[in-house]
Design a protein with these regions (language model features):
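A short, structured loop/turn motif at beta-sheet edges
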Residues: 76-84, 117-123
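Charged, amphipathic alpha-helical segments
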Residues: 78-105
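Sec-dependent N-terminal signal peptides
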Residues: 4-12
Length: 171
């Protein structure tokens, strides 16, 4: 048991040196217009899914998957949510995210994530398979997701506009 703990500690200390990355993103041009984050394992449904965008009438909508669920739930979002996203992008310099992250060693199973932030004139895209960017940058994604989750937590069943299986949801 001690040996396993020691190996786990060594691997966690070496993980910053074990990530490869490629691609780059532009600095944001204009205000954000949509946000998407997905964290998935090897299952059919994502572990975490958030999407923030405006509907055809211009109203802000938040789509998410409930914990361990299979349905996408859509609720109204606050009008200032894009201000929060823009501040996090600037504060954490999310435009420094690389397009792709992966481990130096081959891993045949595991978890993947991706995020896309669209702005008026361009977008930031990043994703990874069993690897993440440096924590000081990834903290910006965590900050956005935490804010979205706080809005979701403050909502009620009466706020639900749509509930649909993830496989059928039109993204």
């Amino acid at each position: 048991m001690k040996l396993l703990l020691t190996i786990a500690m060594i691997l966690s200390l070496l993980s910053p040196f074990g990530t490869k990355s490629s691609g780059k993103n532009p600095k944001p041009d204009g205000a954000s217009t949509s946000y998407e984050f997905t964290y998935s394992g090897t299952m059919m449904y994502p572990i975490t899914f958030y999407e923030v965008k405006r509907d055809s009438a211009g109203a802000v909508r938040i789509a998410y998957i409930e914990h361990n669920g299979t349905d996408v739930v859509v609720i109204p979002g606050p009008e200032d949510i894009f201000d929060h996203i823009d501040r996090a992008v600037a504060q954490y310099k999310l435009y420094k995210l690389k397009n792709s992250y992966w481990p130096r060693m081959e891993i045949l199973d595991g978890n993947g994530w991706h995020t896309r932030i669209r702005f008026q004139h361009n977008s930031i895209y990043s994703g990874g398979s069993n690897a993440r960017p440096p924590q000081k940058i990834y903290a910006g994604i965590d900050a956005i997701n935490s804010y979205i989750q706080s809005v979701i937590d403050a909502s009620s069943e009466a706020d639900v506009l749509l509930r649909q299986d993830y496989q059928e949801y039109d993204r």
